[in-house]
Protein backbone atom coordinates (compact mmCIF):
# COMPACT_ATOMS: atom_id res chain seq x y z
CA UNK A 1 0.00 0.00 0.00
CA UNK A 2 2.80 2.33 0.82
CA UNK A 3 4.58 1.59 -2.45
CA UNK A 4 1.41 2.29 -4.48
CA UNK A 5 0.91 5.63 -2.75
CA UNK A 6 4.49 6.57 -3.51
CA UNK A 7 4.01 5.59 -7.13
CA UNK A 8 0.80 7.60 -7.41
CA UNK A 9 2.47 10.66 -5.94
CA UNK A 10 5.42 10.27 -8.27
CA UNK A 11 3.14 9.94 -11.26
CA UNK A 12 1.22 13.00 -10.14
CA UNK A 13 4.36 15.11 -9.83
CA UNK A 14 5.86 14.06 -13.16
CA UNK A 15 5.93 16.92 -15.66
CA UNK A 16 3.52 15.75 -18.34
CA UNK A 17 2.96 19.19 -19.89
CA UNK A 18 5.01 22.29 -20.62
CA UNK A 19 3.71 23.94 -17.49
CA UNK A 20 4.88 20.99 -15.45
CA UNK A 21 8.32 21.19 -17.01
CA UNK A 22 8.42 24.92 -16.34
CA UNK A 23 7.35 24.36 -12.74
CA UNK A 24 10.00 21.70 -12.30
CA UNK A 25 12.76 23.90 -13.59
CA UNK A 26 11.45 27.03 -11.94
CA UNK A 27 13.57 28.19 -8.98
CA UNK A 28 10.49 29.39 -7.18
CA UNK A 29 9.00 25.90 -7.18
CA UNK A 30 11.79 24.67 -4.96
CA UNK A 31 11.11 27.32 -2.30
CA UNK A 32 7.32 26.97 -2.16
CA UNK A 33 7.56 24.13 0.38
CA UNK A 34 8.83 26.63 2.91
CA UNK A 35 5.92 28.43 4.69
CA UNK A 36 7.96 31.63 4.66
CA UNK A 37 8.85 31.35 0.98
CA UNK A 38 7.97 34.98 0.29
CA UNK A 39 9.54 36.53 3.38
CA UNK A 40 12.95 38.09 3.81
CA UNK A 41 15.33 37.46 6.70
CA UNK A 42 14.00 40.57 8.44
CA UNK A 43 10.41 39.33 8.13
CA UNK A 44 9.37 41.64 5.28
CA UNK A 45 6.88 40.05 2.92
CA UNK A 46 7.93 40.36 -0.70
CA UNK A 47 5.57 41.04 -3.57
CA UNK A 48 4.75 38.19 -5.95
CA UNK A 49 6.92 38.04 -9.06
CA UNK A 50 5.53 39.12 -12.41
CA UNK A 51 6.22 37.40 -15.73
CA UNK A 52 9.42 39.31 -16.45
CA UNK A 53 10.82 38.61 -12.97
CA UNK A 54 10.15 34.90 -13.36
CA UNK A 55 11.84 34.82 -16.76
CA UNK A 56 14.77 37.07 -15.77
CA UNK A 57 15.51 34.98 -12.67
CA UNK A 58 16.03 31.88 -14.79
CA UNK A 59 18.02 33.67 -17.51
CA UNK A 60 20.18 35.53 -15.02
CA UNK A 61 21.37 32.28 -13.49
CA UNK A 62 22.27 30.96 -16.93
CA UNK A 63 24.28 34.10 -17.79
CA UNK A 64 26.08 34.04 -14.43
CA UNK A 65 27.11 30.43 -15.05
CA UNK A 66 28.49 31.31 -18.50
CA UNK A 67 30.21 34.60 -17.58
CA UNK A 68 30.60 35.00 -13.81
CA UNK A 69 32.67 38.20 -14.17
CA UNK A 70 29.89 40.17 -15.90
CA UNK A 71 28.48 43.08 -13.92
CA UNK A 72 24.95 42.82 -12.59
CA UNK A 73 23.89 46.08 -14.33
CA UNK A 74 25.10 44.79 -17.67
CA UNK A 75 23.16 41.57 -17.16
CA UNK A 76 20.01 43.55 -16.40
CA UNK A 77 20.42 45.60 -19.61
CA UNK A 78 20.78 42.49 -21.73
CA UNK A 79 17.81 40.83 -20.07
CA UNK A 80 15.61 43.86 -20.68
CA UNK A 81 16.51 43.96 -24.39
CA UNK A 82 15.95 40.23 -24.79
CA UNK A 83 12.54 40.41 -23.04
CA UNK A 84 11.38 43.08 -25.47
CA UNK A 85 12.49 40.96 -28.40
CA UNK A 86 10.49 37.95 -27.23
CA UNK A 87 7.23 37.14 -28.95
CA UNK A 88 3.93 37.00 -27.08
CA UNK A 89 3.75 33.24 -27.58
CA UNK A 90 7.10 32.83 -25.85
CA UNK A 91 5.95 34.95 -22.90
CA UNK A 92 2.76 32.93 -22.25
CA UNK A 93 4.29 30.29 -19.91
CA UNK A 94 5.96 32.91 -17.76
CA UNK A 95 2.72 34.88 -17.57
CA UNK A 96 0.90 31.78 -16.34
CA UNK A 97 3.58 31.10 -13.74
CA UNK A 98 3.33 34.67 -12.47
CA UNK A 99 -0.44 34.32 -12.14
CA UNK A 100 -0.03 31.08 -10.18
CA UNK A 101 2.43 32.71 -7.80
CA UNK A 102 0.07 35.63 -7.31
CA UNK A 103 -2.80 33.35 -6.32
CA UNK A 104 -0.56 31.39 -3.94
CA UNK A 105 0.67 34.63 -2.42
CA UNK A 106 -2.91 35.73 -1.82
CA UNK A 107 -3.72 32.39 -0.17
CA UNK A 108 -0.66 32.41 2.09
CA UNK A 109 -0.86 36.08 3.03
CA UNK A 110 -4.51 37.19 2.87
CA UNK A 111 -3.89 40.34 4.93
CA UNK A 112 -0.97 41.50 2.81
CA UNK A 113 -0.91 45.13 1.79
CA UNK A 114 1.81 46.63 -0.31
CA UNK A 115 3.83 49.00 1.84
CA UNK A 116 7.02 50.22 0.18
CA UNK A 117 10.05 50.69 2.36
CA UNK A 118 10.69 54.19 3.58
CA UNK A 119 14.22 55.44 3.43
CA UNK A 120 15.61 56.21 6.89
CA UNK A 121 15.88 59.96 7.47
CA UNK A 122 19.32 61.12 8.50
CA UNK A 123 19.19 63.53 11.44
CA UNK A 124 21.20 66.63 10.46
CA UNK A 125 21.67 67.70 14.09
CA UNK A 126 23.55 64.50 14.92
CA UNK A 127 26.53 65.48 12.76
CA UNK A 128 26.92 68.89 14.41
CA UNK A 129 29.44 69.57 17.13
CA UNK A 130 28.28 69.44 20.77
CA UNK A 131 29.05 73.15 21.27
CA UNK A 132 26.55 74.11 18.58
CA UNK A 133 24.02 71.63 19.88
CA UNK A 134 24.22 73.04 23.40
CA UNK A 135 23.50 76.65 22.27
CA UNK A 136 20.57 76.43 19.86
CA UNK A 137 19.24 79.84 20.91
CA UNK A 138 22.06 81.74 19.23
CA UNK A 139 21.63 80.11 15.88
CA UNK A 140 18.13 81.49 15.17
CA UNK A 141 19.30 85.01 15.96
CA UNK A 142 22.23 84.76 13.63
CA UNK A 143 20.00 83.34 10.91
CA UNK A 144 17.44 86.10 11.38
CA UNK A 145 20.17 88.74 11.26
CA UNK A 146 21.49 87.16 8.11
CA UNK A 147 18.03 87.25 6.60
CA UNK A 148 17.51 90.93 7.45
CA UNK A 149 20.60 92.06 5.61
CA UNK A 150 19.68 90.75 2.16
CA UNK A 151 16.21 92.21 2.54
CA UNK A 152 17.51 95.69 3.34
CA UNK A 153 20.36 95.75 0.87
CA UNK A 154 18.38 95.30 -2.31
CA UNK A 155 15.79 97.85 -1.22
CA UNK A 156 18.45 100.48 -0.56
CA UNK A 157 20.34 99.68 -3.72
CA UNK A 158 17.08 99.75 -5.66
CA UNK A 159 16.21 103.21 -4.29
CA UNK A 160 19.69 104.53 -5.06
CA UNK A 161 19.57 103.18 -8.60
CA UNK A 162 16.09 104.67 -9.03
CA UNK A 163 17.26 108.09 -7.83
CA UNK A 164 20.29 107.91 -10.10
CA UNK A 165 18.12 107.06 -13.11
CA UNK A 166 15.69 109.90 -12.32
CA UNK A 167 18.51 112.42 -11.89
CA UNK A 168 20.15 111.33 -15.13
CA UNK A 169 16.84 111.77 -16.97
CA UNK A 170 16.30 115.35 -15.76
CA UNK A 171 19.89 116.42 -16.20
CA UNK A 172 20.80 116.50 -12.51
CA UNK A 173 22.97 113.40 -12.56
CA UNK A 174 26.70 113.54 -12.01
CA UNK A 175 26.56 115.46 -8.75
CA UNK A 176 26.68 112.41 -6.52
CA UNK A 177 28.48 109.11 -6.89
CA UNK A 178 27.13 106.10 -5.03
CA UNK A 179 29.51 103.24 -4.39
CA UNK A 180 28.37 99.65 -4.47
CA UNK A 181 27.67 98.28 -0.96
CA UNK A 182 30.21 95.82 0.31
CA UNK A 183 28.84 92.40 1.10
CA UNK A 184 31.65 91.26 3.44
CA UNK A 185 32.97 92.51 6.74
CA UNK A 186 31.44 94.23 9.73
CA UNK A 187 30.71 97.41 7.77
CA UNK A 188 28.09 95.61 5.73
CA UNK A 189 26.40 94.33 8.87
CA UNK A 190 26.40 97.81 10.40
CA UNK A 191 24.84 99.24 7.24
CA UNK A 192 22.10 96.65 7.34
CA UNK A 193 21.32 97.14 11.01
CA UNK A 194 21.42 100.95 11.17
CA UNK A 195 19.44 101.61 8.02
CA UNK A 196 16.78 104.24 8.72
CA UNK A 197 13.51 104.25 6.84
CA UNK A 198 13.13 108.03 7.26
CA UNK A 199 16.03 108.62 4.89
CA UNK A 200 14.34 106.54 2.25
CA UNK A 201 11.09 108.46 2.73
CA UNK A 202 12.92 111.79 2.40
CA UNK A 203 14.55 110.62 -0.81
CA UNK A 204 11.17 109.59 -2.19
CA UNK A 205 9.69 112.99 -1.23
CA UNK A 206 12.52 114.79 -3.00
CA UNK A 207 12.00 112.67 -6.09
CA UNK A 208 8.28 113.48 -6.09
CA UNK A 209 9.01 117.22 -5.76
CA UNK A 210 11.42 117.06 -8.69
CA UNK A 211 8.82 115.25 -10.78
CA UNK A 212 6.17 117.89 -9.97
CA UNK A 213 8.60 120.72 -10.82
CA UNK A 214 9.42 119.16 -14.18
CA UNK A 215 5.73 118.70 -14.94
CA UNK A 216 5.04 122.38 -14.15
CA UNK A 217 7.88 123.53 -16.42
CA UNK A 218 6.53 121.40 -19.26
CA UNK A 219 3.03 122.79 -18.77
CA UNK A 220 4.34 126.38 -18.90
CA UNK A 221 6.25 125.63 -22.10
CA UNK A 222 3.12 124.15 -23.64
CA UNK A 223 1.09 127.23 -22.66
CA UNK A 224 3.67 129.54 -24.26
CA UNK A 225 3.63 127.53 -27.46
CA UNK A 226 -0.16 127.68 -27.52
CA UNK A 227 -0.12 131.45 -27.07
CA UNK A 228 2.06 131.84 -30.17
CA UNK A 229 -0.46 129.91 -32.23
CA UNK A 230 -3.49 131.76 -30.81
CA UNK A 231 -2.47 135.23 -32.11
CA UNK A 232 -4.53 135.32 -35.32
CA UNK A 233 -8.02 135.06 -33.85
CA UNK A 234 -11.30 136.90 -34.25
CA UNK A 235 -10.94 140.55 -33.14
CA UNK A 236 -13.66 140.15 -30.54
CA UNK A 237 -11.71 137.45 -28.62
CA UNK A 238 -10.35 138.66 -25.27
CA UNK A 239 -6.92 137.05 -25.85
CA UNK A 240 -6.30 139.43 -28.75
CA UNK A 241 -6.73 142.63 -26.75
CA UNK A 242 -3.28 144.17 -26.28
CA UNK A 243 -4.33 147.76 -25.56
CA UNK A 244 -7.18 149.64 -23.95
CA UNK A 245 -8.71 150.63 -27.30
CA UNK A 246 -8.73 147.02 -28.49
CA UNK A 247 -10.31 145.89 -25.22
CA UNK A 248 -13.05 148.54 -25.64
CA UNK A 249 -13.66 147.33 -29.17
CA UNK A 250 -13.89 143.71 -28.04
CA UNK A 251 -16.34 144.62 -25.28
CA UNK A 252 -18.53 146.55 -27.71
CA UNK A 253 -18.63 143.62 -30.10
CA UNK A 254 -19.71 141.29 -27.32
CA UNK A 255 -22.44 143.78 -26.31
CA UNK A 256 -23.73 143.91 -29.88
CA UNK A 257 -23.98 140.16 -29.94
CA UNK A 258 -25.92 140.14 -26.68
CA UNK A 259 -28.30 142.87 -27.92
CA UNK A 260 -29.23 140.83 -30.98
CA UNK A 261 -26.94 142.30 -33.65
CA UNK A 262 -25.33 139.50 -35.67
CA UNK A 263 -21.83 139.78 -37.14
CA UNK A 264 -20.96 137.97 -40.37
CA UNK A 265 -17.46 137.51 -41.66
CA UNK A 266 -16.25 136.85 -45.16
CA UNK A 267 -12.86 135.23 -45.69
CA UNK A 268 -12.92 135.09 -49.48
CA UNK A 269 -10.22 137.69 -50.07
CA UNK A 270 -7.05 135.96 -48.92
CA UNK A 271 -4.07 136.99 -51.04
CA UNK A 272 -0.34 136.51 -50.75
CA UNK A 273 2.11 139.33 -51.45
CA UNK A 274 5.65 138.05 -51.86
CA UNK A 275 7.16 141.53 -52.29
CA UNK A 276 6.59 142.50 -48.62
CA UNK A 277 9.33 140.93 -46.42
CA UNK A 278 7.34 140.74 -43.17
CA UNK A 279 4.04 138.96 -42.51
CA UNK A 280 1.20 141.25 -41.52
CA UNK A 281 -2.46 140.53 -40.89
CA UNK A 282 -4.81 143.43 -41.53
CA UNK A 283 -8.41 143.33 -40.43
CA UNK A 284 -10.53 145.99 -42.15
CA UNK A 285 -14.15 145.86 -41.01
CA UNK A 286 -16.47 147.63 -43.39
CA UNK A 287 -20.22 148.32 -43.07
CA UNK A 288 -21.62 146.70 -46.18
CA UNK A 289 -25.35 146.92 -45.65
CA UNK A 290 -27.71 147.86 -42.85
CA UNK A 291 -31.27 146.86 -43.42
CA UNK A 292 -34.30 146.38 -41.30
CA UNK A 293 -35.42 142.76 -41.17
CA UNK A 294 -39.08 141.86 -40.79
CA UNK A 295 -38.42 141.21 -37.10
CA UNK A 296 -36.93 144.70 -36.76
CA UNK A 297 -33.38 143.66 -35.80
CA UNK A 298 -30.34 145.23 -37.47
CA UNK A 299 -28.02 142.78 -39.19
CA UNK A 300 -24.54 144.05 -39.88
CA UNK A 301 -22.33 142.27 -42.38
CA UNK A 302 -18.59 142.58 -42.22
CA UNK A 303 -15.89 141.85 -44.71
CA UNK A 304 -12.61 140.97 -43.12
CA UNK A 305 -9.90 140.87 -45.71
CA UNK A 306 -6.94 138.94 -44.36
CA UNK A 307 -3.70 139.49 -46.20
CA UNK A 308 -1.12 136.83 -45.43
CA UNK A 309 2.41 137.07 -46.70
CA UNK A 310 5.29 134.71 -46.36
CA UNK A 311 7.87 135.73 -43.82
CA UNK A 312 11.59 135.24 -44.37
CA UNK A 313 12.72 132.72 -41.71
CA UNK A 314 16.19 134.23 -41.53
CA UNK A 315 14.90 137.68 -40.54
CA UNK A 316 12.63 137.31 -37.55
CA UNK A 317 10.53 140.35 -36.73
CA UNK A 318 9.27 140.92 -33.19
CA UNK A 319 6.17 142.65 -34.56
CA UNK A 320 5.26 139.77 -36.88
CA UNK A 321 2.10 137.95 -35.90
CA UNK A 322 0.49 141.06 -34.35
CA UNK A 323 -2.79 142.28 -35.76
CA UNK A 324 -2.74 145.78 -37.21
CA UNK A 325 -5.92 147.53 -36.09
CA UNK A 326 -4.92 151.02 -37.13
CA UNK A 327 -8.10 151.55 -39.13
CA UNK A 328 -10.25 150.53 -36.21
CA UNK A 329 -8.30 152.80 -33.84
CA UNK A 330 -8.70 155.79 -36.18
CA UNK A 331 -12.42 155.26 -36.68
CA UNK A 332 -13.31 154.87 -33.01
CA UNK A 333 -13.66 158.66 -32.73
CA UNK A 334 -16.11 158.85 -35.60
CA UNK A 335 -18.42 156.18 -34.19
CA UNK A 336 -20.55 158.74 -32.34
CA UNK A 337 -20.96 160.94 -35.47
CA UNK A 338 -22.29 158.18 -37.72
CA UNK A 339 -25.52 158.75 -39.59
CA UNK A 340 -26.40 155.06 -39.67
CA UNK A 341 -27.85 153.14 -36.74
CA UNK A 342 -24.54 151.28 -36.10
CA UNK A 343 -21.61 152.66 -34.16
CA UNK A 344 -19.26 151.27 -36.85
CA UNK A 345 -19.24 154.17 -39.31
CA UNK A 346 -15.89 154.44 -41.06
CA UNK A 347 -14.62 156.78 -43.80
CA UNK A 348 -14.26 155.38 -47.27
CA UNK A 349 -11.06 153.33 -47.28
CA UNK A 350 -12.31 150.98 -50.00
CA UNK A 351 -9.82 149.27 -52.28
CA UNK A 352 -10.80 148.09 -55.78
CA UNK A 353 -11.13 144.54 -54.49
CA UNK A 354 -13.43 145.62 -51.68
CA UNK A 355 -15.56 147.72 -54.00
CA UNK A 356 -16.05 144.70 -56.29
CA UNK A 357 -17.09 142.59 -53.34
CA UNK A 358 -19.45 145.28 -52.02
CA UNK A 359 -21.08 145.63 -55.42
CA UNK A 360 -22.08 141.96 -55.32
CA UNK A 361 -25.40 140.67 -54.04
CA UNK A 362 -24.91 139.99 -50.30
CA UNK A 363 -28.48 139.26 -49.40
CA UNK A 364 -29.12 135.60 -50.02
CA UNK A 365 -32.46 133.88 -49.95
CA UNK A 366 -31.53 131.57 -47.10
CA UNK A 367 -30.33 132.77 -43.73
CA UNK A 368 -27.79 129.93 -43.45
CA UNK A 369 -25.98 131.12 -46.60
CA UNK A 370 -25.10 134.42 -44.93
CA UNK A 371 -23.14 132.87 -42.06
CA UNK A 372 -19.39 132.33 -42.56
CA UNK A 373 -19.31 132.23 -46.36
CA UNK A 374 -15.91 130.97 -47.49
Swiss-Prot record:
GO CC annotation terms, alphabetical: nucleus
One matching Pfam family: HMG_box
Composition bias type Low complexity, residue spans: 155-165
A biological process term (GO) from this entry: neuron differentiation
DNA-binding region: 45-113
One of the record's GO molecular function terms: DNA-binding transcription activator activity, RNA polymerase II-specific
Basic residues composition bias: residue spans: 144-154
Record flagged with keyword Nucleus: yes
InterPro entries assigned to the protein according to its UniProt record, in alphabetical order: HMG_box_dom, HMG_box_dom_sf, SOX-12/11/4, SRY-related_HMG-box_TF-like
Assembly mode: Interacts with nlk.2.
Protein name: Transcription factor Sox-11-B
Organism: Xenopus laevis (African clawed frog)
Amino acid sequence: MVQRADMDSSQHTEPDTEEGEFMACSPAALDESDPDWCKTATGHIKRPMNAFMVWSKIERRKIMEQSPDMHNAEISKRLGKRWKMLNDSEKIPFIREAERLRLKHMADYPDYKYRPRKKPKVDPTASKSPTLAQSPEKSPKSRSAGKKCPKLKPSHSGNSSKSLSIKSEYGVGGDYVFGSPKSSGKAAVMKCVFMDEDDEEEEEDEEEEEDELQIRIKQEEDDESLRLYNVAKVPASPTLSSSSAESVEGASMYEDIRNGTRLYYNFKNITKQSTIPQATITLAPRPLLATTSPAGSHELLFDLSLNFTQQNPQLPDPNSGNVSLSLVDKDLDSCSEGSLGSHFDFPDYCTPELSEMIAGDWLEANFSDLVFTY
